[in-house]
Amino acid sequence: FMDVLARVSDFLDHLDRTSGPALVFAHGGVLVAAQVYAGKVKLEDAMKALPPYGGMVEIDLPLPRLHPLMLAGTGSDVGKSVLAAALCRIFLQDGYHPAPFKAQNMALNSYATPEGLEIGRAQAVQAEAAGVPCHTDMNPLLLKPTSDQTAQVVLSGKPIGNRSAYEYFRTEGREELRREVNQAFDRLSARYNPVVMEGAGSISEINLKDTDLVNLPMARHAHADVILVADIDRGGVFASAYGSVALQTPEDRKRIKGIIVNKFRGDLRLFESGVKMMEEICGIPVLGVIPYYHDIYIEEEDSVELSLKQRKAVQGKVNVAVVLLRHLSNFTDFNMLEHDERVNLYYTNNVDDLMKADIILLPGSKSTIDDLYELRRNGVAQAILQARRNGATVMGICGGYQMMGQRIADPDGVEGSISQMPGLG
């Protein structure tokens, strides 16, 4: 018995104890079962605590180390985030210890980690799917647009200042950011198996390849296999998939191991020939065709999704109008209302549609004074006040709540050149 114990102890020295291998073995009709938890319980102590039983020999080995996997896209809003969350949950169900990663996010819908730091909401959802707490290493770089040409840069969960697009993409500090995101990935990879990575937008923006931090250059650093996600619902799926593959370097093209056709509507049999054609022209296998889903409610982070939302009042429901600001922030605040059957939630800056609302919501803004100026210029501010006099309820969140006051002041010019402006109150 002790000879077997010695051999098993030697064997365990070669295992990754963080995976907590379950061990069951027998010798001379004696069965001993033990669970080793990251070295917290010694094998000898665990064996002494268990009664002997007769039985068969079985050793449950740790799961193999997997390559990191990146979901890259033919464009924005093709479904990368949802598929990454799905894979995180599938790996968890299969006994692995996965974690999500996206090197750089551009979104106004952020999420606070347990430490009070900011990451993109998609990675927070993916972390929940993976069964792990969210951390800034999962999204080390977050860009929060403040205007058409500038954004607040959030590094490791903390704002480090505003940058213009040119400054951000073309300055020497870019390589420092690359080191930061690479180190964040390395820390995750040392703790989790596998890391499920997400690219950003399209992988075919060849004019930005030398400064790209999030797509194929990140996959190269991670030695990741890449799956290309193509959206068939918006049309042009063959051109977008083929173009995305063809525009890559030979080295990067080899990383793309498969294609997923997402958001398919109709009878899949009608696309069977399409699968074969795509495999022929791209030279890459199609791993699957995913139906268009209507019942998966995961908070969006991409403003592309906002453009698809309802825009008009309807009869027979409580009409709740969200004022469509140019720099609207955290539109996911209203998702629960969107799924309430009693409510028609719509986004608009049309004066006539605002006047039909029972409730008007002023949302958060990344540039509050600039958005308030625009509301006054286009007549929306006057329409909100008139709707309030007509009996509508007006509520504000964050920057929208500030707009409801008597005056907004920005003496230090944090958001722009306008130092103060009268509010709606």
Regions found by a protein language model. Give the residues of each.
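Domain-level recognition of soluble alpha/beta enzyme cores
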Residues: 2, 39-63
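Short, well-ordered beta-to-alpha junction loops that form the rim of enzyme active sites
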Residues: 8, 25-29, 199-201
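Flexible phosphate-sensing "switch/lid" loops adjacent to ATP/NTP-binding sites
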Residues: 66-386, 393, 413
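Pocket-forming structural segment of enzyme catalytic cores
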Residues: 1, 127, 266-269, 406-425
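Catalytic nucleophile loop
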Residues: 27, 360-364, 384-407, 424
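Phosphate-handling substructures
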Residues: 1-8
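Residue-level preference for the first positions of well-ordered beta-strands
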Residues: 19-25, 56, 68-70, 194-196
